């Protein structure tokens, strides 16, 4: 199988179809950022939201872990309360690396008001780099009945695409970028992911106009668009030029011949909403770059427009980060 997320067809055929114990309390699904377990014996109007985010490698591991947990809960309409960590490290790991990682995680959890309530820490001969699995837990208020139709909604991006991957590449391959760019420019690129949490705009995400939210991560915005369309059974019409992206991300991608629209984009949310222009205005007032990039449509056509040309969006492929 290819590197990265398994194909949607494999996920449905070999994972979801093998899980038969479903109930009204909770069921697995593809294209969702978290699962929700409702327990009427404890609460009639709220459930426990759970998400799992795997982190590979040491680069920005703490930020990717905590920000990923926060944003996946926000996308699920939940308030994050705690995380659980599972760390597998290679045999050449030094204790100071582990201590530094946990100090970073603790500082970010304090910033986001999150508890670390359980975990597992081990050295394994079966891994060659850090594997950090983060289980996020939050409270989701019971929603109104799901909409029957998700067509004719505005598609909005909050945050810029590709900055997680660009920051990681700039950090890991700074010496190669120095062949073309000034050290100060590369240093700025390394910090593209510093503001990766969307918790500051959680109130905006609760607006009634917001119908669906998806956390843009592995596979980039193209993968997120496909996953949202597949989950809601809609088509898409997207204007590529409207997708917000920082110049540093473009430069990093051009140097390594990468497609920024298929590059991991932690710290960015994709929203389907009834009034995109109003939502964009609110995000921009909060200091978040945002834009209406298209609409959901009836049927299954998922179209990407650039100037006068249009092409079909393809199913998610391997994240561009792995090509470097």
Regions of interest found by a model, annotated:
Residues 1-324:
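Helix-biased detector of long, well-ordered alpha-helical tracts
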């Amino acid at each position: 199988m290819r590197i990265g997320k398994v194909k949607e067809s494999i996920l449905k055929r070999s994972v979801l179809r093998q899980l038969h114990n479903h109930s009204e309390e909770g069921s697995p699904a593809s294209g969702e950022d978290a699962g929700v377990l409702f327990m009427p014996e404890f609460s009639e109007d709220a459930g426990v939201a759970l998400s799992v985010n795997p982190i590979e490698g040491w680069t920005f591991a703490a930020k990717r872990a905590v920000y990923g947990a926060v944003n996946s809960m926000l996308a699920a309409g939940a308030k994050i309360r705690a995380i659980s960590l599972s760390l597998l490290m290679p045999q050449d790991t030094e204790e100071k690396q582990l201590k530094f990682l946990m100090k970073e995680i603790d500082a970010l959890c304090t910033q986001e008001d999150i508890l670390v309530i359980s975990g597992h820490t081990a050295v394994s001969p079966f891994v060659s780099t850090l594997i950090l699995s983060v289980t996020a837990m939050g409270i989701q208020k019971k929603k109104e009945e799901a909409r029957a139709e998700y067509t004719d909604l505005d598609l909005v991006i909050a945050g810029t695409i590709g900055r997680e991957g660009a920051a990681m590449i700039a950090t890991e391959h700074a010496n190669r970028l120095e062949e073309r760019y000034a050290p100060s420019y590369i240093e700025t690129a390394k910090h593209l992911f510093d503001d990766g949490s969307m918790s500051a705009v959680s109130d905006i995400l609760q607006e009634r106009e917001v119908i669906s939210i998806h956390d843009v991560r592995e596979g980039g915005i193209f993968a997120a668009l496909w996953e949202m369309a597949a989950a809601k059974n809609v088509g898409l019409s997207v204007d590529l030029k409207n997708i917000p992206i920082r110049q540093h991300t473009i430069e990093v991608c051009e140097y390594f011949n990468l497609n920024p629209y298929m590059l991991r984009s932690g710290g960015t949310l994709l929203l389907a909403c009834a009034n995109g222009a109003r939502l964009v205005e609110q995000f921009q007032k909060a200091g978040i770059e945002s834009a209406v990039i298209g609409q959901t449509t009836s049927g299954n056509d998922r179209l990407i427009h650039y100037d006068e040309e249009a092409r079909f969006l393809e199913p998610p492929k391997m994240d561009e980060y792995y090509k470097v």
